[in-house]
Every structure is written in C-alpha cells, then in structure tokens.
Amino acid sequence: MKSYLFLTVHLILLILYPAICLADADRIFKENNRAVVVVIAYDKQDKPIGQGSGFIVRPDGAIVTNYHVISNAVDIKVKAGDKVLKVEGLLHIDRENDIVILKADAKNLPTVKLGDIEKATIGEKVYVISSPKGLENTISDGILSGIREISDKRKILQITAPVSPGSSGGAVFNKNGEVIGIATFIIEEAQNLNFAMPVNLIKDKISAKKVIALKDAGIEDYKETADYWFTLGYFYGEAGLHKEAIEAYKQAIRIKP
C-alpha cells in the first residue's frame, strides 16, 4: 500500500513539474523584464559596433553588462523598454572577469534583486533573461550544471539555459528571481556549453559613486587583451577542444608574456 501511494505521489509530481517550471518562468519574467535592458555600443561615426544585454542594479541607472559588449565604444546607449538612455560613463571596470557597470542618465528605474552564488546548488533551475540576436528580452531556462574554478579565486558558472549572440550581459536568475550570474560566453563549437560570471563579483561594487567618463575609461578591444584569450582557452578546454585551447593560451602569452 505504501509503495503504491509513493508511486502515485511521485507520478503526480512528475506530471506537475513542467507546469511548475513554466509558472516560475512566467513569474520571473514578469517581475524582472523591465529591469533587463539592451546595451548598444557606437563608434566615433555614431555607428553601432556591438550589442548585448544588461540588467539594472540601481534606480539611478547603474547597469551591469559584459566588458566585451562595449569593446571600442566611443558612445553607449541603453534601451530600457520604450526608453533610450544615454550612458554617462562607467562605475566599475573588471576586464579580467569581463564585467563593467555602466552609469546611465536616469532615475526611478526598476531593479533586479541580487542573490548569492555561495548558496547555489549544482542542478538547480536557472532562467536567463536577455536579448539574443536582437530579440528583446526573451527568457530561457536550464540548470546550473557546474561551478568551475578558472584560477585562484576566480569562478565561473556553467549553465544549460540556451543563450545566443546578444545574450552577453544578460541576467541569470535562480528560482527565487534573484540574479546569481551574468551570461558571458558561449562555446558555439560545443552543444549547450554556456558560461556566466558569478554576481558576487559585483555585489560590493554597485554602490560606487565616481563616474569615469567614457573618453577616460580606456575602453579597448577585448579580443586584443590577454584576459580574453586566457578565458577563451579555459572555456575551450572545458569543451574538450584542446587544440583551440592551446592556441588561445599561446595568444594570451603573446599579448602578455
């Protein structure tokens, strides 16, 4: 009798699980959609040279995205719903981890809630809100499949939630609707290998007040930095693409012997 009851309950849970996940995705999207933005980088001719995603962490326009999204930018604009916000400058630059915090000219913006990756568990459900391939604010879901150590004190998150070009800088949420990661890298040569930087890297940086003007920030081409090639080499290694990993590491050494 107990076995029958257990099987019945287990079957009911299996039937309900997809509906529960869909409900979570719908709730998370509705709660956070307005706090996820499109980030567009422009050159000195005012032509767009890069586009990615970002998320708002302060009502006055502090926005987190990837450094590579704004590579070589002379001007940056943020599309938040039907508003286009001009970026005044940068509050924080972390080239090593491919993270930047922008400061847009804004007030009373909706914000996301930040979680703690130290409390995350492998296998837990995650949701990514981003703008892949220019499709504004779409949501995808998957699991947190790994927390990897690139080097001493550097961690990355491996997720199965589908992401595409344009998703970089997007928010990775847990089931509680808290951001635990920043969608950062896709290994296109390997199926379902997507990586995110832990949100803990920026939690103590979002209160920064000093704005660095774009012209003084020294924004360079991320692909011309050793940090880019070192990180790429690590990701290739995780994907089993050892030849590509070696070449990436060699390039990192060429740039920074």
Where are these regions (language model features)?
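Conserved active-site neighborhood of the chymotrypsin/trypsin-like protease fold
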Residues: 45-48, 58-130, 134-138, 152-156, ...
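Catalytic nucleophile loop of clan PA
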Residues: 55-56, 144, 163-183
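Conserved structural position within tetratricopeptide repeats
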Residues: 251-254
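C-terminal cap/linker of serine protease catalytic domains
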Residues: 23-30, 39, 73, 88, ...
